[in-house]
Amino acid sequence: MKTTFLDFEQPIAELEAKIEELRFVQDDSAVDISEEIERLSKKSQQLTKDLYANLTPWQVSQIARHPQRPYTLDYVSELFTDFHELHGDRAFADDQSIVGGLARFNGHACMVIGHQKGRDTKERAARNFGMPRPEGYRKAERLMRVAEKFGLPIFTFVDTPGAYPGVGAEERGQSEAIGHNLYVMAELKTPIIATVIGEGGSGGALAIAVADTVMMLQFSTYSVISPEGCASILWKSAAKAPEAAEALGLTAHRLKALGLIDKIVNEPLGGAHRDPKGMAALLRRALGDSLRQFQGMSVDALRERRFERLMAYGKFKETTPRA
């Protein structure tokens, strides 16, 4: 698949187009231009390194939404074996914006749950662009209860603009479904490892991200609102999205510094979409390390650790004013 370049990547796109053109010429010519191709390839690689070393939060937001970025099912196929998808919330419907099922990770039985956006127009519509309805969150909760019953660790993958705000979703109890998931995940008797792989949009993300370990991919985002939504409220214009992204502090490095996530998983040069298999290998190592941390831990110790972790959020210290 041909790589889609974002607006700020146009200098890289122009170099790559030139390299592709030279390769095409070389195939039909007796002239050896391999040295020139190699020179331009190195130049493109260095340009990518320089560009990605100085990304703004708004640019990171664009990468997190890249249409070729790996989604949950892509990671499932690379990281897990014997995946058996489970459907429905046993109450209303099967929401395809959340996928989940039984699988094996490095030989260990587990439960996998995650948002799924879809690649083409038809699939995006079927999966509601990765925006779950209440039945999606209730399906996730049902699968978590199954995992708890059989003592299976839970891996969740977060990638959503947010919970679906439609009238039908509200009528069926969207806020209740999200709130109930937060409650359930806080007291589950099995390890939970959450990874933000793309967009982490507000409560729609949090509903499957209350975990013992929360990781973020290097160019993913996690915030209470999208930059465009924030800009529309504060500045009455979505054009202020870059400023809003800066103010929201939605990048992995910012959230790690604040103690809101536990680990950042580095991405291949140019982002996960440039090397999905390489990204999967890096993520496999990080997930394995996290799982080993909880193996052998008693249920009481696991829940106590999770409780203390959650209670540590938002802590503050009162001080007396200086005279």
UniProtKB/Swiss-Prot annotation:
PROSITE patterns according to UniProt: COA_CT_CTER (PS50989)
Keyword terms of this UniProt record: ATP-binding, Cytoplasm, Fatty acid biosynthesis, Fatty acid metabolism, Lipid biosynthesis, Lipid metabolism, Nucleotide-binding, Transferase
Enzyme class: transferase
Quaternary organization: Acetyl-CoA carboxylase is a heterohexamer composed of biotin carboxyl carrier protein (AccB), biotin carboxylase (AccC) and two subunits each of ACCase subunit alpha (AccA) and ACCase subunit beta (AccD).
ATP-binding listed as a keyword: yes
Main location: cytoplasm
Entry superkingdom: Bacteria
A GO CC annotation given for this chain: acetyl-CoA carboxylase complex
Sequence similarity: Belongs to the AccA family.
Role description: Component of the acetyl coenzyme A carboxylase (ACC) complex. First, biotin carboxylase catalyzes the carboxylation of biotin on its carrier protein (BCCP) and then the CO(2) group is transferred by the carboxyltransferase to acetyl-CoA to form malonyl-CoA.
EC id: 2.1.3.15
HAMAP family: AcetylCoA_CT_alpha
Localization in the cell: Cytoplasm
GO MF term list: acetyl-CoA carboxylase activity; ATP binding; carboxyl- or carbamoyltransferase activity
Pathway it works in: Lipid metabolism; malonyl-CoA biosynthesis; malonyl-CoA from acetyl-CoA: step 1/1
Reaction it catalyzes: N(6)-carboxybiotinyl-L-lysyl-[protein] + acetyl-CoA = N(6)-biotinyl-L-lysyl-[protein] + malonyl-CoA
Protein name per the record: Acetyl-coenzyme A carboxylase carboxyl transferase subunit alpha
